[in-house]
Amino acid sequence: MASYEYVSPEQLAGFDKYKYSAVDTNPLSLYVMHPFWNTVVKVFPTWLAPNLITFSGFLLVVFNFLLLAYFDPDFYASAPGHKHVPDWVWIVVGILNFMAYTLDGVDGKQARRTNSSTPLGELFDHGLDSWSCVYFVVTVYSIFGRGSSGVSVFVLYLLLWVVLFSFILSHWEKYNTGILFLPWGYDISQVTISFVYIVTAVVGVEAWYEPFLFNFLYRDLFTAMIFGCALCVTLPMSLLNFFRSYKNNTLKHNSVYEAVVPFFSPCLLFILSTAWILLSPSDILELHPRVFYLMVGTAFANSTCQLIVCQMSSTRCPTLNWLLLPLFVIVMVVNVGVTPYVESILLFTLTAAFTLAHIHYGVRVVKQLSNHFHIYPFSLRKPNSDULGVEEKNIGL
């Protein structure tokens, strides 16, 4: 398994022909953030590899997740009568979230600035973004939490899926049209949430208990904004871009079946994970919501990364992700009946297995593409073909 190759020779050949094509029409991104990023990128030395910037931003997102997991493990810290998250934590999380967003915005500019743009860089960026979705959503949840003043863990589960499907829609579009239409919601949500974290530190979580307008609570506004943005903006725009490509006869997949294949694994993941929640004898989502979310988000990220590889290499997306097989088995076992202790062990084991499998997938794909393009993933130095494998082995790739 240590030398397993996930990227096929056909896909490697497809990467050689790949040309980046994206459309960004978001006014916030075009007129505010891009000028800001153009200034920030000048701070970085020209020897700094773009992938190192990307990975650093991802680590900040994970750190925020772990920080709030420590202070708010079960999402009760924001509820009345419970010990709240310290104000300084919200300030740290807000600053680091904006820093992560900034690093995600400047990595591509650093690549163009240093003339080091490669398909690996885009895959690395978007692959980590797919995993960041779950960390970002679950971290935001701590602002409201659950309880009388918050949102139930099942509603948050549904909100997580809305975000996940919104993310994969962009890459489904590109899989079919060849063009990545950058979603508006990403930039708006990152700036807004970074600000909300800081505001929470100033006014306290108690401020979110109060009605916003006409007895409309902030938690309801939070929920409505996510559902509304997905249903009224993200989904219609994706379908519009798809049908424009269909009308112009530029679709890359002519049959309906081939066009929707990328949705099979995510939909099966949704069905299986929801079935587990509904069939659980111990109400597993109530017991371990944070771990359950992480399990779902990691499995989703793995399927999304496979889609991105196929989309960039112009190859067919796998019909199903075999990573879902153990989840199917566990759902069947839970349906028969298990004790709460055993069910918890199954969840923690599966989450650990998904995480290790996804990390293995990522490391191996990065190594394959690094070897193929004769580059180092985290250095701008150009390796000799004879020593590339040796040095990567030394740094753990």
UniProtKB/Swiss-Prot annotation:
Pathway the protein takes part in: Phospholipid metabolism; phosphatidylethanolamine biosynthesis; phosphatidylethanolamine from ethanolamine: step 3/3
EC id: 2.7.8.1
Reaction it catalyzes: CDP-ethanolamine + a 1,2-diacyl-sn-glycerol = a 1,2-diacyl-sn-glycero-3-phosphoethanolamine + CMP + H(+); 1-O-alkyl-2-acyl-sn-glycerol + CDP-ethanolamine = a 1-O-alkyl-2-acyl-sn-glycero-3-phosphoethanolamine + CMP + H(+)
Cofactor(s) needed: Mg(2+); Mn(2+)
Enzyme class: transferase
Transmembrane segments: 47-69, 84-103, 123-145, 150-172, 179-201, 221-243, 256-278, 291-310, 317-339, 344-366
Record bears the keyword Transferase: yes
Role played: Ethanolaminephosphotransferase that catalyzes the transfer of phosphoethanolamine (PE) from CDP-ethanolamine to lipid acceptors, the final step in the synthesis of PE via the 'Kennedy' pathway. PE is the second most abundant phospholipid of membranes in mammals and is involved in various membrane-related cellular processes. The enzyme is critical for the synthesis of several PE species and also catalyzes the synthesis of plasmanyl-PE, a lipid required for proper myelination and neurodevelopment, from 1-alkyl-2-acylglycerol.
PANTHER family, sorted: ETHANOLAMINEPHOSPHOTRANSFERASE, ETHANOLAMINEPHOSPHOTRANSFERASE 1
Protein name listed in UniProt: Ethanolaminephosphotransferase 1
Organism: Bos taurus
